[in-house]
Amino acid sequence: MANEKAFNLQSAYSDLNKACSAQAYDKIINISGKILTKFPGETKAFQCKVVALIRAEKYEDCLSFLKKNPTLSSHVIFEKAYVEYRLNRLTEAAKTLESEEASDSKVQELKAQVLYRKGDFAGAYAYLRTVIRNSQDDYSEERLANLTAVAAAESCFNNANLDLDVNPQMYEGKFNLACYHLGRGDCYLASRSLDDAENTCNLCLSEDPELTEEERNEELAPIRVQRAYILQLNKEEEEANQVYQSVIRQRASDPALLAVAANNIVCINQDQNIFDSRKRIKMASTDGLQFKLFSRQRTDMLINQALFYWYTNQMEACTAKLRTVSQEELSPRALLLSATQLIKEKNVDKAVLLLQSYLSNFAGSQIDAEIPLALAQLNLRRTSANNLGTGSPQPKNALNVAQMLENILPQHLIHSPGVLSTRIALYLLASSGENAVQTRPDSMKQIVNCIESTLHYYEELGEQNEIYSHLLDNCAAFLLQQGEAKLAAELLEKQLARLESNICQEKQNSLIKQVLVARLVRAYAQFDRPKAEQTCKSLQAKESLSEADVDTLETTFLYGAKSLKRLGKPSEPTDTSDKGKSKRSQIKKSISDIPSSEDPGAQPVISRPKRKKRKVRLPKNYQPGVMPDPNRWLPRRERTHYRGKRRDKRFAPTRGPQGQITGESEWDAAIRSPKVKIPEDGSAGSTPKQMSNTAKQQQKKGRKKGR
């Protein structure tokens, strides 16, 4: 029996070896299954069947087979994790890989793939770096393409920059490099990388003569879509829309690419071209896309669709899309859109409660700035229940919002320059107007505390921070304007100390230093007069602003060259070459032609004799103790008693109704005129005789002559 057993097993393995050499995966599955039926503990047969199921892409059958044999599954941990990865069970795949030895390069590479699909791009980047450093095979270019894809995803979705010093040769790697530059906001480098990727792709495709035009377009479709996205970023939406439409008409085999193009078309259309947008939304909502897109991409697509429904007043569809987003992840954009929808329905209280519930679930640095700022805006504008005011906010609301921001915002947001200026404005608003809830000194105390805490926060981070220098300047100017001279002087002293410590840029800081010293003198003058006088000595005073003759320039501006000649006053000779130029340019040239005192070869300026002071001539009716008429210095037409030049209107014909005179009966000529006899009844109805034709002609001729 033992010899028969050995013989049967040996022949079975021989058949299995032949099937493996021929890559007949169905035959491998049958033979290894027969071996495991008779000999359940055969590890080699078990491994062969698992690999054959993977090669045949029967991942569900493979995973169920592994679960039925938990004892032998410990020998194929990597294969089990790969099957779970292909079935999009990423969490289970990550747990399976934790029990595998981490030093194995293939395990590290699979871990990088799993982390990349889960959205942990930094972890995937670290694993891929290790694999590339330790591997020496023919797949280095593929790994470089994967590395650039990871760096591009990190820059696009997380706004983080990973060091990428690679020069991929494959067009896939060049395409990923273009996406990396796009994530960093550099459209120029992205366009250049896309050009390189397209040229490399065309060169590779030209080597295959059997390639059809459809297959060529399918390979170039991702590059064209990315180029259209750059056009869309540059506000060239019509050109981008044409590219998206052409890619969709070609019907690429990648559903994720079609979904991205359709989503971008919806963004371009907004609330226009509703029929086309509905078709694109349907294309971007096909089944299976959740496994081909990142979670950030899926969320953005759903929010864009909800925005389209919101613009077109389809509130039920908008709510359904937002509900789908909330089931996957809690997105701040989706939450803001839900609050906007409630405000549109005039449910302001529900919108406030929705935002407050989000803030209560998150604390610390996890809070996005959009949610608390939106809540602050609602509380600031809310006048009563479910009503938002449009005028100036109430001081009570301003004080409550300022205190709310201090309680809910994390440190890095509460001390940002924008939030600091907002808090200062709110405290000033709380102490202004008739309904002020606190006095101006109390508000200034709170403002000073805000400024001091913010400056202390940046001092701990490092005084070389640019934001710290910006805050010192602006806070000092504000405090000096509000009368807080002592604190303003302290801030100016700190800024001067920072400038003096920076020796490298001494020439650039000299002018800034003079400005700060001037501000410091203003601050000292309000509480320490001797110190202000001492600080004034460090200011660099100029002896003269210009070498030009100020009196000549003033008279030239006031009277002009012709008036000076007419009055007999001396004027500078004009150059004939400057006839066509303006008077201002001629004056500039005259100033530039004057030699400066610093030039050793310049001729000395001849001093002109001083003019005699004109004797004061007082008017004849001058009275020493009486205030003169203030209108005497105004032009004649601007004086209060000026009525203009009167005209003789006695012979001018009167036009229109001239009013009624009380004594009109005295001047009525009809009263004093004799009475006219009224004709009898028979003659009253008679008509005048008709004129003859000859009389009419004579009358017409007479009119012509009169003309």
UniProtKB/Swiss-Prot annotation:
Ranges of compositional bias, category Polar residues: 684-695
InterPro entries named among the record's database cross-references: Signal_recog_part_SRP72_RNA-bd, SRP72, SRP72_TPR-like, TPR-like_helical_dom_sf, TPR_rpt
Compositional bias per record (Basic residues), positions renumbered to this chain: 608-618, 638-649, 698-707
Transmembrane as UniProt keyword: no
Residue numbers spanned by region Disordered: 564-707
Subcellular location: Cytoplasm; Endoplasmic reticulum
Protein's job: Component of the signal recognition particle (SRP) complex, a ribonucleoprotein complex that mediates the cotranslational targeting of secretory and membrane proteins to the endoplasmic reticulum (ER). The SRP complex interacts with the signal sequence in nascent secretory and membrane proteins and directs them to the membrane of the ER. The SRP complex targets the ribosome-nascent chain complex to the SRP receptor (SR), which is anchored in the ER, where SR compaction and GTPase rearrangement drive cotranslational protein translocation into the ER.
Family the entry assigns: Belongs to the SRP72 family.
UniProt name for this protein: Signal recognition particle subunit SRP72
Gene that specifies this protein: SRP72
